[in-house]
From Swiss-Prot:
GO CC annotation: cell surface; extracellular region; phosphopyruvate hydratase complex
Any coiled-coil regions, as ranges: none
Enzyme type, top EC level: lyase
Organism name: Salinispora tropica (strain ATCC BAA-916 / DSM 44818 / JCM 13857 / NBRC 105044 / CNB-440)
Active site feature: 205 (proton donor), 335 (proton acceptor)
Gene name for this UniProt entry: eno
Source taxonomy: Bacteria, Bacillati, Actinomycetota, Actinomycetes, Micromonosporales
Name this protein carries in UniProt: Enolase
Length: 427
């Protein structure tokens, strides 16, 4: 197998105009592969550390030249000569070199950039697609695209509390048709918003970001768009939410729609919402430290709704293990930069799947043209991917990669569809 001959890192811009890390790995057989690291807006307190320079007169303190230097001055010498196929060994070398629990010494953005680029290089050297290299001969499941078509919270300058209102086209026979139906609903929503004199400006992830009287009003608008596009709500198209409740949690209470609420009151709100709309999944419905609230909500509606931990778990196997033990949530959102290495990401997915938890592969609000998560979604067979609206090239790049993968798989491809949400029963 080819060995690592050189590693180059650079500072590039993400989709929000903020710096991020890009890494190129060169092998002794002439292979060169590149990976770029995403960045979040609403970040969990327990995420691995994203190293920023902090120089206020340069990129408002968000530069990543220190992370780049850590790669070129510290990581490179440790990895030269290793076989690129030794992913776990290479990642462990970087973790040992960092020496902290949260990757604060080298930076998760430095470690992850190298980790992903090494995997891509190894796949290329083996003349395999990344999804096949990571997932093996049985990787064949195309995920349901969880399309964030209306943005609120930290992803938009609007008065809507819930961060993401997603549509999931579970009734389509293929990923290609699922993407088409999602795009058609997205365009129909723009038409609905215009007709009602509501703003059609876009949030970070390509979804519309109007001011609305209530959060439920967003679901009403999307329901109208689904009908306008000619699809059946609850059968062809269902809803999913990312509440990002930590963003409006303070001093033990949730300030939601201008009113302070307890965890029990928030849980009651979600239950009523799920009774009124075809909601299959709710992400971060409660704060990242509200373990008792998570347990209560999961016990209450977890038999019919996917309860997803993002800030709760931060793709960290230790926190996921606690969630499994305490029956807090029943699904894990998977973000490679939350944990900071490919090996740990795959370990997190494996742990969740062995416990019967579902997984949803996810982008970040600050993205690049890198499409690694599309391949990861297929490689891990998670059946769900969250990568924004069908707009903005940083989001669409992942969907387009999945189209290519489906084409490559040909007759072996299977679309997850409604099987991705076994708890949901359509009306």
């Amino acid at each position: 197998m080819a060995t690592i001959e050189g590693i180059v890192a650079r500072e590039i811009l993400d989709s929000r105009g903020n710096p991020t890390v890009e890494v190129e790995v060169g092998l002794d057989d002439g292979t060169i592969a590149r990976a770029a690291v995403p960045s979040g807006a609403s970040t969990g307190a327990f995420e691995a550390v994203e190293l920023r320079d902090g120089e206020k007169d340069r990129y408002l303190g968000k530069g990543v030249t220190q992370a780049v230097s850590n790669i070129e001055d510290k990581i490179v010498d440790e990895l030269i000569g290793y076989e690129a196929s030794e992913q776990r060994l290479i990642d462990q070398k970087m973790l040992d070199l960092d020496g902290t629990d949260n990757k604060s010494q080298l930076g998760a953005n430095a470690i992850l950039g190298v980790s992903l680029a090494v995997a891509k290089a190894a796949a290329s050297a083996a003349e395999l697609n990344l999804f096949r290299y990571l997932g093996g001969p049985n990787a064949h499941l195309l995920p349901v695209p969880m399309m964030n078509i209306l943005n609120g919270g930290a992803h938009a300058d609007s008065n809507v509390d819930i961060q993401e209102f997603m549509i999931a086209p579970i009734g389509a026979p293929t990923f290609r048709e699922a993407l088409r139906s999602g795009a058609e609903v997205y365009h129909a929503l723009k038409s609905v918003l215009k007709k009602k004199d509501l703003a059609t400006g876009l949030g970070d992830e390509g979804g519309f970001a109007p001011n609305l009287p209530t959060n439920a009003a967003a679901l009403d608008l999307i329901s109208e768009a689904v009908e306008k596009a000619g699809y059946r709500l609850g059968t062809d198209i269902v809803f999913a939410l990312d509440v990002a409740a930590t963003e409006f949690f303070e001093n033990g209470t949730y300030t939601f729609e201008g009113v302070e609420k307890t965890a029990e009151e928030m849980s009651s709100y979600y239950t009523k919402l799920a009774d009124a709309y075809p909601i299959v999944s709710i992400e971060d419905p409660l704060a990242e430290d509200d373990w008792s609230g998570w347990r209560t909500l999961t016990a209450s509606v977890g038999d019919r709704i996917q309860i997803v931990g993002d800030d709760l778990f931060v793709t960290n196997p230790q926190r996921i293990a606690r969630g499994i033990a305490e029956n807090a949530a029943n699904s894990v959102l998977v973000k490679v930069n939350q944990i900071g290495s490919l090996t740990e990401t795959l370990d997190a997915v494996d742990l969740a799947h062995r416990a019967g938890f579902r997984c949803m592969m996810s982008h970040r609000s600050g993205e690049t043209e890198d499409t690694t998560i599309a391949d990861l979604a297929v490689a891990t067979g998670c059946g769900q991917i969250k990568t924004g609206a069908p707009a903005r090239s940083d989001r669409v790049a992942k969907y387009n990669q999945l189209l290519r993968i489906e084409e490559e798989l040909a007759d072996a491809a299977r679309y997850a569809g409604s099987g991705a949400f076994p708890r949901y029963r359509s009306a």
